[in-house]
């Protein structure tokens, strides 16, 4: 009876403050991720900076990369020195100012202002991203609600991404790049006010002091120091090895996953005369390339609950759930197939435009690959990392995505030296081979965490 009552508990109102804050922030971020790649490579006459597609890819890659690195430091600051309730709205304010720098870049034709935008948005994300989740988690007295709560929060993230990327192209082509950056900034300024007033109303005292303040250890300081100085056991070393192994494969996955967006815009997309290798027309309507990003968000919204049900059913079956190694391998296999399809579409089209359904298939497969293992990284690390190095190990995952983010722009530049079909077909084959190897060695790798 008690369990039934618990499942019917309402989420605290502060949870919805945090979740909707994520929606506003992600609306702006994913819009800007698409916008910066387009704006940088568009000609001066078209309102862009007039740089190359590889410059656009690298700029977009830097935005992705540094927004994964800075939350490591932002969490450290909120843990020890500055109130998370200050960090979070300060972060959204800095992001808003960053997007205003994008507006100034469009007004002045300044590359330096785009770099300043990336810096401010990255610092702001560092103060916001992890700390808003930290506040959110502490709002719940019943910790059994956390898994479902963060699943719902993830849906709010994807809703923000979907709305932003679906609408942004109309704004960009309707009123220009500069005003579009202003729209992104206004979303963050609104988010700042939402957090300040919503936090006052519904957060109570949570987050007023750094997270580590008032948190007590069961161990005495003397015992803790003794524990920290003891060498790692053989099992702990094996588990750390397993974490690094999964992380290594995740770097390969994310480099290729983020790379997908570059040929979609600069090879297949309708935005550049030298691209346009696919037919984006439906009747008299040209499908915006930003909707490829929208497709990813929509897939996460639709297939997320379905996959969760599949994993739950699998976990309750006699065979049990797939291991993290197999889920990582499955994600890589799906992504590899997406690249093989993209290379195949290039061969099949000949001198004509490819059917848009090829692009849709690529988007669905890469999204499914993401959903198979992406949400499980921190869970895997939290489950198997030795407690004394948990913080360090949790930092490994976002650092891996930072490395991937920094790399994909350069990989896109390198692949541009070769014919499209063989270059991207080889990338797909490499990812498929990695997935097959990881799947086949699953039993051996699982001994590391048993």
Predicted regions mapped to residue ranges:
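Glycine-rich segments within core transmembrane alpha-helices of 12-TM secondary carriers
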Residues: 67, 147-173, 185-191, 296, ...
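Central cavity-lining transmembrane alpha-helices of secondary-active solute carriers
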Residues: 60-79, 294-309
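C-terminal ends and interior cores of transmembrane alpha-helices
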Residues: 93-109, 332-351
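Hydrophobic core of transmembrane alpha-helices in multi-pass small-molecule transporters
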Residues: 111-128, 351-372
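Short amphipathic helix-loop junctions that connect adjacent transmembrane helices
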Residues: 34-57, 260-291
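Intracellular juxtamembrane helix-capping segments at the cytosolic ends
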Residues: 127-141, 371-385
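Conserved MFS/SLC helix-loop-helix module at the cytosolic interface between two early adjacent transmembrane helices
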Residues: 71-100
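Intracellular loop-helix junctions on the cytosolic face of multi-pass helical membrane proteins
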Residues: 1-17, 142-147, 168-285, 307, ...
């Amino acid at each position: 009876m008690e369990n039934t009552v618990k499942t019917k508990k309402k989420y605290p109102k502060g949870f919805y403050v945090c979740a909707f804050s994520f929606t506003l922030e992600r609306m702006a971020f994913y819009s800007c991720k698409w916008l910066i790649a387009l704006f940088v490579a568009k000609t001066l006459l078209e309102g862009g900076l007039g740089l190359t597609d590889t410059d656009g890819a690298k700029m977009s890659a830097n935005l992705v990369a540094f927004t994964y690195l800075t939350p490591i430091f932002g969490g450290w600051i909120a843990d020890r020195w500055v109130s998370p309730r200050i960090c979070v709205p300060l972060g959204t304010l800095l992001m808003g100012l960053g997007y205003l720098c994008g507006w100034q870049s469009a007004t002045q034709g300044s590359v330096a202002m785009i770099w300043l935008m990336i810096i401010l948005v990255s610092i702001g994300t560092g103060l916001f991203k992890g700390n808003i989740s930290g506040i959110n988690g502490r709002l719940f007295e019943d910790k059994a609600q956390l898994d479902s709560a963060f699943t719902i929060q993830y849906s709010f993230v994807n809703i923000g991404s979907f709305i932003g990327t679906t609408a942004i192209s109309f704004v960009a082509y309707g009123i220009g790049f500069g005003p579009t950056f202003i729209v992104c900034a206004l979303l963050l300024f609104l988010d700042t006010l939402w957090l300040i007033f919503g936090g006052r109303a519904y957060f109570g005292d949570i987050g007023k002091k750094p997270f580590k303040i008032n948190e007590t250890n069961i161990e005495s300081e003397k015992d803790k120091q003794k524990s920290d100085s003891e060498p790692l056991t053989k099992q702990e070393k094996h588990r750390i090895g397993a974490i690094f192994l999964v992380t290594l494969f995740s770097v390969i996955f994310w480099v290729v996953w983020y790379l997908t967006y570059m040929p979609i815009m600069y090879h297949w997309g309708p935005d550049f005369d030298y691209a346009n290798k696919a037919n984006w027309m439906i009747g008299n309507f040209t499908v915006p390339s930003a909707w490829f990003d929208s497709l990813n968000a929509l897939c996460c919204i639709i297939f997320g609950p379905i996959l969760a049900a599949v994993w739950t059913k699998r976990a309750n079956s006699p065979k049990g759930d797939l291991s993290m190694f197999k889920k990582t391998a499955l994600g890589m296999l799906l992504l590899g197939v997406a690249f093989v399809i993209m290379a195949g579409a290039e061969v099949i089209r000949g001198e004509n435009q490819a059917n848009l359904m090829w692009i849709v298939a690529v988007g669905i497969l890469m999204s499914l690959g993401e959903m198979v293992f992406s949400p499980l990284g921190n869970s895997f690390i939290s489950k198997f990392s030795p407690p004394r190095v948990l913080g360090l190990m949790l930092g490994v995952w976002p650092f891996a995505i930072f490395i991937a983010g920094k790399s994909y722009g350069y990989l896109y530049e390198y692949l541009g030296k070769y014919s499209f079909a063989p270059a991207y077909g080889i990338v797909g084959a490499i990812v498929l081979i990695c997935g097959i190897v990881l799947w086949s060695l699953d039993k051996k790798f699982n001994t590391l965490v048993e």
